[in-house]
Amino acid sequence: CYSNGRCYGAPASRKERKLTMIEKVNPSHPDKVADRIAGAIVDLAYKTEAAPKIAVEVLIGHGKCHVIIETTAAINPLDVEDAIHRIAGAVWADIDIVPQDKHLSDNQSAGIRCGDNGIFKGMPLTEEQKALSVIAHDIYTHYPYDGKYIIDEARLIICQSNASTAELSNMYPPAEVNPLGDWTGGTDVDTGATNRKLGSDMADSVTGGGLHGKDLSKADVTLNIYAFLKAQETGKQVQIACAIGDDIIDGHPYQELVDIAAEYISSVGGFEKFAEWGLF
């Protein structure tokens, strides 16, 4: 526990309890910058259509941002460029917008059905995972720059760019802070790509697909959200598998699960906001 009253875990042998490790990155990590841009573009699609189909890939780094968008929605490239600059600053934007594959479009023409094959798992969050999220949010309010944080049982590691190691050590005295010293980060130091921080987004619920840059017909979004929420509610592991085109999943119409996911996305402020921290 720290002087501010927050605790992240207690020492225990590996035999006494299940090994707990968790990583969390903040919204300014290059991979999360890519996720946020992808989320902002999905938000644009939902402004033009009630149920758009869209898949976005973003690669960003060293002054350049490459974006590929496959969609049914009529998205203005200038709006995409504005979103890139708002999130990532004055980078050169390479934007490619292509129509969705006709066969995939036909699959959804009679109504929303599962948009992909996949396996999904929801796991209840551990106390350490919840605590690390609190720590990450707390540090980010003081230092809104690229950072990564890890808990390995009783070990807390804080790597925070553009921050005083001494100040962070005072905030979290037992932590290992910036082991190699003060540093700068961001997309001029590292590159970022969509859906590379699955553990940070989903904790132990990681299976196959990522959460970002996709509409709600995509099982990677809707079923990951549904499985995660169900696991938190029941306190038990949730496992789901689906085939593309399925209209009943876990005993529910797929549209019902889409509605649950849509409500969750709305509650956090949209796809861009969802991309900042993921599911926890």
Protein language model features and the residues they cover:
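Short, Lys/Arg-enriched N-terminal segments with co-localized hydrophobic residues
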Residues: 1-20
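A domain-level signal for the structural core that forms small-molecule/cofactor-binding pockets
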Residues: 17-280
